[in-house]
């Protein structure tokens, strides 16, 4: 009886999700754009004002920037049609795609490539000089749904040093990339993994003292953070959104993303993330 009730509840929630998505406006007057909650929310809103202005001008629509409390909240907001566009991390995109009908359409180009790296850092006083030294130590990650601050560094440690999180070292989820850098610099964690770009930005704006941390290594190149949109937006609006993003040439907008341009992407570009999840035994639909 309990199993039947659970099954009925699952079906009901799925139906509600589908109806909510269907009910979402195909051509909304105000476009709700969610930003990846990997840094301070007010800082993200302020820094992305040029993007908001650019989109309003070129899409001829009002734009509302949204920063959810965490990755899971953003995934659920997209699932229920409460946001129209979202700037995901690769892992959070794959998770969202497994739960909702969305389409990736653009990603940043940096140094001529639509790819990026994670960096693994250590506190200089931790006694950690290489990955193998992390055995028995405290490793800080960002959000569980983060690619560059969880999935990638965890995979690097597994593949290069045969270290399993929660088994060979303590793993602590501190929420954001910034928090990873701060916890490592302050000695609350021996090491941590985060986006190379965000690590460099944290040092540049004085969030951490660079002399308190050292770089242990970098990951390989992975597909950049994707912009995605609801599939049930009107075909005309979807085409316009794609064209506007790929055509962004405003220096201020690009500078805030530390990008040279935006390039078209497809769902298949993120199969490498799905493969990493399989290696770690992750079920994206239940995360």
UniProtKB/Swiss-Prot annotation:
Annotated signal peptide: 1-23
The entry's keywords: Signal, Transport
Any GO BP: transmembrane transport
Membrane-spanning intervals of the chain: none
UniProt-listed InterPro entries: PhnD
Cystine pairs: none
Entry's Gene Ontology cellular component terms: ATP-binding cassette (ABC) transporter complex
Protein name per the record: Probable phosphite transport system-binding protein PtxB
Job of this protein: Probably forms part of a binding-protein-dependent phosphite transporter. Required for oxidation of phosphite to phosphate.
Pfam families: Phosphonate-bd
Family under the similarity heading: Belongs to the phosphate/phosphite/phosphonate binding protein family.
């Amino acid at each position: 009886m309990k199993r039947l009730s659970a099954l009925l509840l699952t079906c009901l929630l799925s139906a509600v999700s589908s109806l909510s998505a269907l009910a979402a406006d195909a051509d909304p007057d105000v476009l709700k754009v969610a930003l990846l909650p990997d840094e301070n929310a007010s800082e993200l809103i302020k820094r992305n004002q040029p993007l908001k202005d650019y989109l309003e001008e070129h899409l001829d629509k009002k734009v509302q920037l949204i920063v959810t409390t965490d990755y899971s909240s953003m995934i659920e907001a997209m699932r229920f049609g409460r946001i129209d566009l979202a700037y995901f991390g690769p892992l959070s995109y794959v998770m969202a795609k497994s739960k909702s009908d969305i389409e990736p359409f653009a990603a940043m180009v940096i140094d001529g490539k639509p790819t990026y790296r994670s960096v693994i850092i250590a506190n200089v006083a931790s006694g950690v000089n290489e990955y193998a030294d992390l055995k028995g130590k405290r490793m800080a990650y960002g959000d569980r749904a983060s690619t560059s601050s969880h999935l990638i560094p965890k995979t690097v440690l597994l593949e290069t040093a045969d270290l399993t999180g929660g088994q060979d070292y303590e793993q602590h989820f501190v929420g954001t990339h910034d928090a990873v850098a701060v916890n490592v610099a302050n000695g609350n964690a021996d090491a941590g993994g985060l986006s190379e770009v965000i690590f460099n930005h944290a040092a540049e704006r004085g969030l951490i003292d660079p002399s308190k941390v050292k770089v242990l290594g970098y990951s390989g190149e992975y597909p950049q953070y994707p912009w995605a949109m609801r599939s049930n937006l009107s075909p005309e609006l979807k085409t316009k959104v794609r064209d506007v993003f790929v055509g962004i040439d405003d220096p201020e907008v690009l500078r805030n993303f530390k990008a040279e341009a935006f390039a078209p992407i497809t769902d298949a570009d993120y199969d490498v993330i799905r493969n990493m999840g399989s290696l770690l035994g992750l079920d994206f639909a239940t995360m």
